Amino acid sequence: MTEYKEIIVALIAVFGAVIPYLLQKNKELNLKIAEQKREAYASFLKNFTETAVAVMHDEEVSGKDADRDRMLARDQLLLYASDDVIKAYDEWVRYGDMEKHDLEKEDELLNLIFLAIRKDLLGKTNLTKEHLSNLNPFNRG
């Protein structure tokens, strides 16, 4: 019976050391992913804003460098964006690709992307797509 007590005490000691270590490593990994997610969204929004400014000033938004920058920003979304952000982005792109589309509806879909990004980063938000409308670079220069 004494030998079992020693084994139990040893197991408790091992689990007492291993479990906090694993929890700490998991927390560190989640923080690293959250930081990479923020960087991915920041890169996407920066590229998006640069493109919006170019469009508003009738500047060229194509070419090798511009295409590469857009693709790299989208690659980061592919890696780190939530499913809701990717779905909102997909819906916006598909709607924008339609031959005839309403610009107000397109702005609404873009605001839904912004809302999904906020929800992903913050976990929740009390804002609506209407609250984000004035932050849309196509609504306000």
Residue ranges: model-predicted function:
Residues 1-3:
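Membrane-interfacial hairpin junctions
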Residues 12-15:
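Single-pass membrane-anchoring alpha-helices
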